[in-house]
Regions:
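Active-site region of glycoside hydrolase catalytic domains
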Residues: 1-265
Length: 265
């Protein structure tokens, strides 16, 4: 509200990280676990931003775990009166979860992201045998990108912009070049699925990759690189910090020049 009042001609929207969530199996317990995790992972933030209410499943979950937020008189009314103009979101990978009964040992899901996708008594991150993984244990799921776009648009009917989408990998500099076809394949497949979501009827007005240049990853430092431009340094060795354009740089330059029409390279 404050932004709209001070800048009435400016549009504003949230930018959370959102992903499709799959149940490990068709076991109703796994389906229920995936449903709860979806509410926590995705709808908690967006329900507040768009509808001005806490998701009912998440509220019950927080209450059961004695983690309800402190609310002052009038807070709910302020939330309810707020309005966003669009939804920005980041997508890197989908998630797969299974039921995690209290007092039991986790059966699967030991990879990077899955370890944080876990709450005993509710859900646990799990492997997905139908999807490939990056060397850092992230699911590669372009189809899940289309699913995520359609889920968000169907639920909220707000224009969408993708603010981050990319692949973090260990790039190798060889004779001043970086041949990162894996990144090109990842981005091409995701853009194709985004185009299909638009064909489905979703209103997507923008797409941004992550990232233009290598930067420090919060999980793996400079070992995990996302950029189109290689920075010649390591975690504890700055080297010469020289920049090198990767193969993906030239590929994406063509994608931009063709407004997404040229995806083959």
């Amino acid at each position: 509200n404050n932004c709209h009042e001070k800048l009435p001609h400016v549009k504003i929207g949230p930018a959370p990280n959102i992903s499709a969530v799959y149940p490990k199996s068709n076991n109703p317990a796994d389906v229920q676990a995936a449903d709860l995790y979806t509410a926590i992972r995705n709808w908690l933030y967006l329900d507040i931003a768009v509808y001005g209410v806490y998701n009912h499943q998440v509220w019950a979950y927080l209450e059961e775990n004695e983690a309800l937020p402190d609310m002052e008189p009038g807070d709910l009314e302020i939330l309810k009166s707020a309005e966003c103009d669009f939804i920005a979101f980041n997508y890197y990978n989908s998630s797969t979860v299974q039921a995690y009964p209290a007092g039991t040992e986790r059966a699967t899901g030991k990879k990077d992201q899955q370890l944080s996708d876990s709450q005993e008594g509710f859900f646990a991150g799990s492997d997905n045998e139908h999807l490939p993984y990056t060397e850092f244990g992230w699911q590669i799921d372009p189809t899940g990108f289309r699913t995520t776009i359609n889920q968000i648009y169907s639920r909220y009917r707000k224009p969408l912009i993708v603010t981050e989408n990319g692949l973090g990998g260990i790039d190798k500099l060889e004779d001043g070049k970086v041949h990162d076809n894996y990144r090109i394949d990842y981005l091409r497949n995701h853009i194709e699925q985004m185009n299909l979501a638009v064909t489905d009827g979703a209103d997507v007005f923008g797409y941004c990759t992550w990232s233009a240049i290598d930067l420090i990853s919060t999980h793996q430092g400079f070992r995990k690189r996302y950029g189109f431009v290689y920075v010649n340094r390591e975690d504890f060795d700055l080297k010469d910090l020289k920049r090198y354009r990767k193969d993906s740089f030239y590929w994406y330059k063509g994608v931009i020049a063709s407004n997404g029409g040229k995806l083959e390279g």
